[in-house]
């Protein structure tokens, strides 16, 4: 798969995506990296530790998050993207579901859009932007309720809907990654199930990204707070690797 100018053999060589939240209120690390110097130092540390992609996020998407304006989100992420591009030779993913933010991010140098609403957010213009910019896109499963008739099959069907949106806009298959959306539109049992059956996403024909890092499902299972979820993160990441996932989005 090509992400910007970078080529990855994801089928044979899975990679780590390092999380860089430049937000004051992310569930796990809000406020830690929301200035340029701290963000660059953390980026350097993650690359040293093996991250092959840096995922920049300017708005928390934790449960109960506060929606911010496009302008505020752009003001958070664009300077960071520009500085990372100046200082490091690494592809940048932008974690946003807003087309205006994504456009500004791509213009600043982002190589990939990580869309937690799977191209289904209200403006419905994200797919057109991805098609025109040729950026890679991670299509995540999400919904605003936890009602399913046949859970795993429903997740696959809803991801197919997102993929259809991408195709209709002219997005190429070579640009697409899919994500089961652990922690999004799912209750505790459903999160456990989608991790268990994450290999089913391979049926869609795209690389699979798995993001379980520090998620509440780990905290509930092990009865630990967000600062003590490393063991659960490692365990679920290993499960994902064994089930064919190609990209692992992690804090550590």
List PLM regions with ranges.
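Active-site-adjacent loop and "lid" segments of alpha/beta metabolic enzymes
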Residues: 3, 11, 28-42, 61-79, ...
């Amino acid at each position: 798969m090509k992400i910007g100018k970078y080529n990855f053999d994801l089928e044979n060589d899975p990679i780590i995506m390092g999380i860089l939240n430049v937000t004051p209120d992310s569930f796990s690390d809000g406020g830690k990296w929301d200035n340029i110097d701290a963000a660059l130092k953390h980026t350097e540390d993650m690359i040293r530790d093996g991250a092959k992609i840096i995922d920049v996020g300017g708005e928390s998407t934790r449960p109960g998050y506060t929606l911010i304006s496009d302008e505020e989100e752009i003001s958070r992420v664009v300077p960071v993207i520009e500085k990372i591009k100046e200082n490091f030779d690494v592809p940048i993913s932008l974690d946003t579901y807003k087309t205006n933010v994504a456009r500004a991010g791509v213009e600043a140098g982002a190589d990939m859009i990580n869309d937690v609403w799977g191209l289904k957010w209200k403006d419905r213009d994200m797919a057109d932007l991805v098609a025109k910019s040729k950026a890679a896109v991670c299509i995540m499963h999400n919904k605003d309720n936890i009602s399913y008739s046949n859970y795993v099959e429903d997740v696959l069907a809803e991801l197919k809907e997102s993929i259809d949106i991408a195709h209709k806009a002219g997005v190429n298959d070579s640009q697409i990654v899919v994500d089961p959306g652990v922690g999004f539109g799912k209750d505790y049992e459903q999160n456990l199930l989608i991790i268990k059956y994450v290999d089913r996403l391979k049926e869609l024909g795209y690389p699979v990204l798995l993001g379980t890092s520090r998620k509440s499902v780990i905290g509930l299972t092990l009865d630990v707070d967000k600062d003590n979820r490393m063991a659960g993160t490692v365990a679920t990441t290993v499960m994902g690797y064994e089930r064919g996932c190609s990209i692992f989005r992690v804090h550590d």
